[in-house]
Amino acid sequence: MNEAEHSVEHPPVQGSHVEGGVVEHPDAKDFGSAAALPADPTWFKHAVFYEVLVRAFFDASADGSGDLRGLIDRLDYLQWLGIDCIWLPPFYDSPLRDGGYDIRDFYKVLPEFGTVDDFVALVDAAHRRGIRIITDLVMNHTSESHPWFQESRRDPDGPYGDYYVWSDTSERYTDARIIFVDTEESNWSFDPVRRQFYWHRFFSHQPDLNYDNPAVQEAMIDVIRFWLGLGIDGFRLDAVPYLFEREGTNCENLPETHAFLKRVRKVVDDEFPGRVLLAEANQWPGDVVEYFGDPNTGGDECHMAFHFPLMPRIFMAVRRESRFPISEIIAQTPPIPDMAQWGIFLRNHDELTLEMVTDEERDYMYAEYAKDPRMKANVGIRRRLAPLLDNDRNQIELFTALLLSLPGSPVLYYGDEIGMGDVIWLGDRDGVRIPMQWTPDRNAGFSTANPGRLYLPPSQDPVYGYQAVNVEAQRDTSTSLLNFTRTMLAVRRRHPAFAVGAFQELGGSNPSVLAYVRQVAGDDGDTVLCVNNLSRFPQPIELDLQQWTNYTPVELTGHVEFPRIGQVPYLLTLPGHGFYWFQLTTHEVGAPPTCGGERRL
């Protein structure tokens, strides 16, 4: 293990500070930098991402909250699992009124998590294991306690007076929707110090930055340079559609936003090649595709973007036992530039958002997946994957197979690989942000602190609680969900078609079965056939596979040969919520690869 994982040799620089009315920030040169991974401009296309909350993963300091040193301690587990990149939500200094998305200092780590030096040690330790790290960057707004905002409200004519969107009236930009409809009545709030209204698309304690001010643009680019200079592999850009405001528009997806993102991309490409920008834009695919930029250049804005509308439709398709919700949203998704990639997910740290569905579809999802009102949050459902699926192992495996085989780079949420549950009586989104369940011991093996000091209580549910569901028990059980997930990740890694293959839906005779081919062309190409039964009952399917006549389907987890494809429709029968992954090959089949020395099914 590298020395950086154990010790910090010099005192940390303590973030930003105000001096003479000017906010001074540290420089990346004040710190060490992490070991670099080999340059690969397309690494993100092949990567499996793993979202982990620093606070929730492991507590190395025994104070009741997870920390950066705790995450370093658990990197060997993530390497064993087989993920390629860690996504860290905000770990910056914050009042924590919105889970860290209310940033008080972009240049400082929240003290209970550690220091910037600890963060550099984390990136270095991850890189030495072949794991990359991207972090959240909240570009749209700050906390009201950020020194930029405090100086802006104190001195309207000072250097920060125009850092935020101020107005004498709250009647501007009236066409902009209110995003947090369950807590906010307006996008404007009155500041008693400056005696003006300030604009906020999210909570009232999160004032929006004014990107019409060139100084704000430069300040954010400086933040980007700082963290990339320390060695991280990219950013998830939070809430990017809302950076600019214009009268007569909904203040989303504006041309000015795209122009600024092109500036950011150029800085990244010129100064930090191989780093990645991932857009969080909860919009329809036709709008989101614009965040990739110019297709004639391969894309000149963000390298990746989340495909939000796909996620609820996976849940809808399985509950309705019909492929059409998935088929239709994929058909509505425009082509993307050659150097771009979708990010797809089942669950994350927020609610299962239902913004990108119709009112009728939203009512259906609430009725099916959120029967208790406490399961709802804003316009969505605050539940983890396993409880959403009633802890049905077949459904969980089917959803995992869809996540790993549909177009895009998959994002796993910490704990879903073992089937963790949630605690719905906790407020806001905390119910899906509980401590990772490592062992059946006290505090789920997450912390040695007194249980009363934990940032949130672990689940003690008889089905999902840590005594029943934990890494220690599942790691030693070959048939566990954890080992199933690990095996599927290993299979995916061996076949580039899953990462970069073209997508061709096959239709078929049965609407309850979703079948598609992922294919990389060429002499060294790779063709994978994926067949998914969305019904709880066994289903037959006849597929037209004539273009692969004389190919042999080889099932990928067991390496079993199925009958050769001929001119007639190819008949398969799938168990309820079952799936197949086949490689279509004309070559002689060899011995199956193994995962970790043994083949786990």
Curated annotation (Swiss-Prot):
Gene deletion effect: Cells lacking this gene are as virulent as wild-type in mice, however also show a profound impact on intracellular and capsular glucan. It is not possible to inactivate Rv3032 in a mutant lacking treS, suggesting the joint essentiality of the different alpha-(1->4)-glucans biosynthesis pathways involving these two genes. Combined inactivation of glgM and treS results in absence of alpha-glucan.
Binding sites annotated in the UniProt record for Ca(2+): N140, D208, Y242, L243, E245
Annotated Gene Ontology cellular component terms: cytosol; plasma membrane
Catalytic activity entry: D-maltose = alpha,alpha-trehalose; Endohydrolysis of (1->4)-alpha-D-glucosidic linkages in polysaccharides containing three or more (1->4)-alpha-linked D-glucose units
Enzyme nomenclature, EC number: 3.2.1.1, 5.4.99.16
SUPFAM superfamilies cross-referenced by the UniProt entry: (Trans)glycosidases, Glycosyl hydrolase domain
Catalytic residues identified in the record: D238 (nucleophile), E280 (proton donor)
UniProt-recorded name of the protein: Trehalose synthase/amylase TreS
Source organism (scientific name): Mycobacterium tuberculosis (strain ATCC 25618 / H37Rv)
